[in-house]
Amino acid sequence: MPADRPLTNSVIARWEGGWRCRVTAAGFDLVVDEPESAGGTGAGPMPTEYLLAAMSSCYALALCWSAGKRGVHLPDLTVTATGTYDGPRFSGLVLEVATSAPAEVVSPLIKPALRACYVSNTIASSPPIEVVIAGAPP
């Protein structure tokens, strides 16, 4: 691939009625739905929960990558992403890192991992969103 051509990645969401979609990503199917209290069937996480899942998992992997590059062993790791709703968006996002590794070992990994995390970088840079009408779905 030419160096001047950016890499791209796509996922497909197919509406299944109500508040439910089936998303295909890398050959995997994900169900997206709203809770019953919001008119959905509760058959899957909400889109915003998938956003938080993407952020927490991407940061966890970036943190492990950052540790590996520095020869640091993390015996265990949990990353919790929490978003604060403010109308139709999150007004704030918090990543909470839990590990039995000492804080003085983990602290130097935090910023490099944040720089390496595609999801947090994308959210922080707020890229423009273009909507294109493609015609009838396949």
Residue ranges and their predicted role:
Residues 1-53, 61-138:
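Extended beta-strand/beta-hairpin segments
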